[in-house]
C-alpha cells in the first residue's frame, strides 16, 4: 500500500534532507590532506563537490577507494568549458574543468572531485589506473573538449569520426548547422572516411597472429541485426573463439548535450525522450527533477504519483521488448509478437493520458502537462488484470526452456567486483548480489511511499540471471501501478511556484503582470538561479542522471547526461574474452541497450 501520501508536500526536497557540505567524507579528506588542500563548493546537487589540485588527483582517488567504506564505482567523468561562466564566486580560477563522480555503495553516498585547468595546459593524469571504466569517459572528454589525459592507453575520438576537426562542447564551437559551411561529400572525402574506419590491430595493442596461425578480424555491425542498432564490434578471432574485441560507438551521436545549451529549460524536455527512445517519460524524470532542484520547487502529491505511474508503465513497456528480443536472439520467434500485443495495451493507455505514444514530452517543470483524463483508471485496471497471466506464459513457454537456459546460463558472467569496476548498474549489478536500486536506496518522486521489492541475484551476473531479474522487476512494477490506481491523491497537477513552466494560464486573465510573466516564460523560458543540480534515477536499463549547471539564464550552461548503456557496452571485452561468437550474440541481447542511450 502507499503510505503517508498526504504528508509528501510537507517534506523537504530530497536534496535538502542532508547537508552535503557536512558529509563525513569531507572530514576524512581534511584529516588526510589538510584543511587547505581543497575547496568545497556549495551546490544543489546533494553531493559533496570538492575542487582539488591536479597533482593530488590520483592520490585522492586512491584514498577514497581504500577508505573503510570505500568509493568503489566511478559513476561519471566529464568536463566543462568554464570560460564564459559568469557566476563562479569562491571557485578556483579555471578555463576548463574535469569532474569525477564516485559512489560508495556501503555509505550510499557520493562525492564529486573537480580539477581546474588553464586553457594553455589542458592536461590531467589518466584515472584508468584506479578505475578501468575511466577509459571511455576520458576519450569522450578529449573528443568533445580537447582535454588530454596523460598516460591513457589509447586516447582517440569515440563519439565523433576520426577525421573530425575541433571539439564540439567548447563554447567557441558552433551549436547550429546554419553556422557551418554547406556539407559536401566528395569522392575523395568518402575515401578518406572509409580509410579512417579501417581497423588497424596495432593501434589497439593486438597481434595479427601467432607463430602458427593468423587471427581473423571480423566486423560485427554496424548494421548487424544482433548489434541492436548502429553499433560495430571488431572481433579478433581464433576460429570461433573471441580472443579480444573492440566496441566502436558514435554512429548515433546527435549532440544532445550541446543542444541543451541552445534550448530553454522548458523546450529541452522533448529532447530527453530521445536519449533512450524506449523509456518515454522515464527519461524526462531526472531532467525535470534536476531543474526543480535549481528552482526550489516541491510538486504536489498528485504529480509525484502520476509521474511514478507513467514511469512504471514505460518500464514495463521497455522490459517486455527486452525480454522478447532476448528470446528472439537465442532463437525463438513467437514471444516477440506476443509482447508487441501487450505493449500496444500500454501505448493505448499512455496515449490516452498524454496524447502521444513513444515520446510524450509530458512532464513539466513543476508538474505535468495536464490532469489525468476521465477513464484512465479503467484502462489501467484492464491492463493490470491482463498482464500477470501473459507474463507467466512467457516464463513457462520460453524462459524455462532447456535450450534457452543452456545458451545463456554461465555466459558472459561476472561478479560484484567487475560490475563495480566497469560502472555497471541496473539488473547487471543487482544480479551480482548487490542490492542497489535508486528507487529504494535514494527515493525520488515519492517512491519511498510505495511497497515493492528489489529482485537481487545470487552473486554471479550471467545472461540468464539478468533476464530473469527483469521479469521479476516487471512484476514489481505491476505492484506499484496497482498502488497508483488505488491511492491516486486528489489535488493540482502543477506546483504553485513562480518558476512552474508553463505557469497557470487562468491567472493571465486577472492582471497584466501575470500575462507578461506567462508570455516571457513560454517564449524565452524561465530564468533559473545560478547553481548546479544533479538527479539520478533508476531508468529502464540502469542508472540515468542529469547534471545541470545554470549560469542564471533561460538556458543550461552545461547539461551532462550520464546513461547506463554507455558503461555497459564498455564492459563487453572484459566479459566476453575467451567465449564464442554465438555467446556474444546472447550477451548483447542480455545487456538491454539502445544506441541512442549510448551515443546521445
Curated annotation (Swiss-Prot):
Gene3D superfamilies: Cytochrome-c3 Hydrogenase, chain B, NADH:ubiquinone oxidoreductase, 30kDa subunit. Keywords: Cell inner membrane, Cell membrane, Membrane, Multifunctional enzyme, NAD, Quinone, Translocase, Transport, Ubiquinone. Its EC number is 7.1.1.-. Residues 214-600 are annotated as: NADH dehydrogenase I subunit D. It is found in: Cell inner membrane. It is a peripheral membrane protein. GO terms for molecular function: NAD binding; NADH dehydrogenase (ubiquinone) activity; NADH:ubiquinone reductase (non-electrogenic) activity; quinone binding. One of its GO terms (cellular component) is plasma membrane. It catalyses: a quinone + NADH + 5 H(+)(in) = a quinol + NAD(+) + 4 H(+)(out). Residues 1-190 are annotated as: NADH dehydrogenase I subunit C. It comes from the Bacteria. NDH-1 shuttles electrons from NADH, via FMN and iron-sulfur (Fe-S) centers, to quinones in the respiratory chain. The immediate electron acceptor for the enzyme in this species is believed to be ubiquinone. Couples the redox reaction to proton translocation (for every two electrons transferred, four hydrogen ions are translocated across the cytoplasmic membrane), and thus conserves the redox energy in a proton gradient. In the N-terminal section; belongs to the complex I 30 kDa subunit family. NDH-1 is composed of 13 different subunits. Subunits NuoB, CD, E, F, and G constitute the peripheral sector of the complex. This is NADH-quinone oxidoreductase subunit C/D.
Amino acid at each position: 500500500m502507499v503510505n503517508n501520501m498526504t504528508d509528501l508536500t510537507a517534506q523537504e526536497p530530497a536534496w535538502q534532507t542532508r547537508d552535503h557540505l557536512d558529509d563525513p567524507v569531507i572530514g576524512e579528506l581534511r584529516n588526510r590532506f589538510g584543511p587547505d588542500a581543497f575547496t568545497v563548493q556549495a551546490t544543489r546537487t546533494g553531493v559533496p563537490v570538492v575542487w582539488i589540485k591536479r597533482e593530488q588527483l590520483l592520490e585522492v582517488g586512491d584514498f577514497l577507494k581504500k577508505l573503510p567504506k570505500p568509493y568503489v564505482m566511478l559513476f561519471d567523468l566529464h568536463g566543462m568549458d568554464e570560460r564564459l561562466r559568469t557566476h563562479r564566486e569562491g571557485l578556483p580560477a579555471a578555463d576548463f574543468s574535469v569532474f569525477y563522480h564516485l559512489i560508495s555503495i556501503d555509505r550510499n553516498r557520493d562525492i564529486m572531485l573537480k580539477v581546474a585547468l588553464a586553457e594553455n595546459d589542458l592536461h590531467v593524469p589518466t584515472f584508468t589506473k584506479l578505475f578501468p571504466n575511466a577509459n571511455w569517459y576520458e576519450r569522450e572528454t578529449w573528443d568533445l573538449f580537447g582535454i588530454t589525459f596523460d598516460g591513457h592507453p589509447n586516447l582517440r575520438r569515440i563519439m565523433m569520426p576520426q577525421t573530425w576537426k575541433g571539439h564540439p562542447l567548447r563554447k567557441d564551437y558552433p551549436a547550429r548547422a546554419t553556422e557551418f559551411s554547406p556539407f559536401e561529400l566528395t569522392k575523395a572525402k568518402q575515401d578518406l572516411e572509409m580509410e579512417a574506419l579501417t581497423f588497424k590491430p596495432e593501434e589497439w595493442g593486438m597481434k595479427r597472429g601467432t607463430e602458427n596461425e593468423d587471427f581473423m578480424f571480423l566486423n560485427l555491425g554496424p548494421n548487424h541485426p544482433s548489434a541492436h542498432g548502429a553499433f560495430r564490434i571488431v572481433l579478433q578471432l581464433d576460429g570461433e573463439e573471441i580472443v579480444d574485441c573492440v566496441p566502436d560507438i558514435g554512429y548515433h551521436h546527435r549532440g544532445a548535450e550541446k543542444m541543451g545549451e541552445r534550448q530553454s529549460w522548458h523546450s529541452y524536455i522533448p529532447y530527453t525522450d530521445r536519449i533512450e527512445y524506449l523509456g518515454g517519460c522515464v527519461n524526462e524524470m531526472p531532467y525535470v527533477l534536476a531543474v526543480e532542484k535549481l528552482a526550489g520547487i516541491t510538486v504536489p502529491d498528485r504529480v509525484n504519483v502520476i509521474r511514478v505511474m507513467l514511469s512504471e508503465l514505460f518500464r514495463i513497456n521497455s522490459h517486455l521488448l527486452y525480454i522478447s528480443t532476448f528470446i528472439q536472439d537465442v532463437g525463438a520467434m513467437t514471444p516477440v509478437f506476443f509482447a508487441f500485443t501487450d505493449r500496444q495495451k500500454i501505448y493505448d493507455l499512455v496515449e490516452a493520458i498524454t496524447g502521444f505514444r513513444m515520446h510524450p514530452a509530458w512532464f513539466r517543470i513543476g508538474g505535468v502537462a495536464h490532469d489525468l483524463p476521465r477513464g484512465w483508471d479503467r484502462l489501467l485496471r484492464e491492463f493490470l488484470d491482463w498482464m500477470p497471466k501473459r507474463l507467466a506464459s512467457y516464463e513457462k513457454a520460453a524462459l524455462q526452456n532447456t535450450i534457452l537456459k543452456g545458451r545463456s546460463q554461465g555466459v558472459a558472467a561476472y561478479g560484484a567486483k567487475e560490475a563495480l569496476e566497469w560502472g555497471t548498474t541496473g539488473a547487471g549489478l543487482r544480479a551480482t548480489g548487490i542490492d542497489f536500486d535508486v528507487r529504494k536506496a535514494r527515493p525520488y518522486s515519492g517512491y519511498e511511499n510505495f511497497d515493492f521489492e528489489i529482485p537481487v541475484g545470487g552473486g554471479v551476473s550471467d545472461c540468464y540471471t539478468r533476464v530473469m531479474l527483469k521479469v521479476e522487476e516487471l512484476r514489481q512494477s505491476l505492484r506499484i501501478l496497482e498502488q497508483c490506481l488505488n491511492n491516486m491523491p486528489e489535488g493540482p497537477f502543477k506546483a504553485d511556484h513562480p518558476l512552474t513552466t508553463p505557469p497557470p494560464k487562468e491567472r493571465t486573465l486577472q492582471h497584466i503582470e501575470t500575462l507578461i510573466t506567462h508570455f516571457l516564460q513560454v517564449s524565452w523560458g524561465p530564468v533559473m538561479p545560478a547553481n548546479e543540480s544533479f538527479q539520478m534515477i533508476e531508468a529502464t536499463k540502469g542508472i540515468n542522471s542529469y547534471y545541470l549547471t545554470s549560469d542564471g539564464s533561460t538556458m543550461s550552461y552545461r547539461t551532462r547526461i550520464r546513461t547506463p548503456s554507455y558503461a555497459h557496452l564498455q564492459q563487453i571485452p572484459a566479459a566476453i574474452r575467451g567465449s564464442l561468437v554465438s555467446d556474444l550474440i546472447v550477451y548483447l541481447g542480455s545487456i538491454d541497450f539502445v544506441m541512442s542511450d549510448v551515443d546521445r
